[in-house]
Amino acid sequence: MSVNDKTIKRIAHLARIAIHDNETERITKKFNAILDFAKQLDEIDVTGVDPLISVIPMTLRTREDSITDGNKAADIVANAPVTEENFFLVSKIVE
């Protein structure tokens, strides 16, 4: 696959980028170089190679999930102007 000036102008239009006519040739060459590199990567035989998830092998420490209120309800509502039984009280806005 290769890119031509018409394609560059269309991409620029879709991206809402102003490109002058004297720039299209340079940008076309850069796009084609990127596509050629991607084609080279596509030609590499990776059969039998395990997918690389991370460069450094890591295992995450896990913990058992437990549901709690955090024992911080009083701290959370401490700055509220009006509360009742650890709930925020607000004025009625909509009838």
From Swiss-Prot:
Gene Ontology molecular functions: asparaginyl-tRNA synthase (glutamine-hydrolyzing) activity; ATP binding; glutaminyl-tRNA synthase (glutamine-hydrolyzing) activity
UniProt keyword terms in alphabetical order: ATP-binding, Ligase, Nucleotide-binding, Protein biosynthesis
Entry-linked Gene3D superfamilies: Glu-tRNAGln amidotransferase C subunit, N-terminal domain
Disulfide bonds: none
InterPro entries: Asp/Glu-ADT_sf_sub_c, GatC
Catalytic activity: L-glutamyl-tRNA(Gln) + L-glutamine + ATP + H2O = L-glutaminyl-tRNA(Gln) + L-glutamate + ADP + phosphate + H(+); L-aspartyl-tRNA(Asn) + L-glutamine + ATP + H2O = L-asparaginyl-tRNA(Asn) + L-glutamate + ADP + phosphate + 2 H(+)
EC number, as in UniProt: 6.3.5.-
Biological process according to GO: glutaminyl-tRNAGln biosynthesis via transamidation; regulation of translational fidelity; translation
HAMAP family per record: GatC
Function description: Allows the formation of correctly charged Asn-tRNA(Asn) or Gln-tRNA(Gln) through the transamidation of misacylated Asp-tRNA(Asn) or Glu-tRNA(Gln) in organisms which lack either or both of asparaginyl-tRNA or glutaminyl-tRNA synthetases. The reaction takes place in the presence of glutamine and ATP through an activated phospho-Asp-tRNA(Asn) or phospho-Glu-tRNA(Gln).
Protein family membership: Belongs to the GatC family.
Record's subunit section: Heterotrimer of A, B and C subunits.
NCBIfam families linked: gatC (TIGR00135)
The protein's name in its UniProt record: Aspartyl/glutamyl-tRNA(Asn/Gln) amidotransferase subunit C
Source species: Bartonella bacilliformis (strain ATCC 35685 / KC583 / Herrer 020/F12,63)
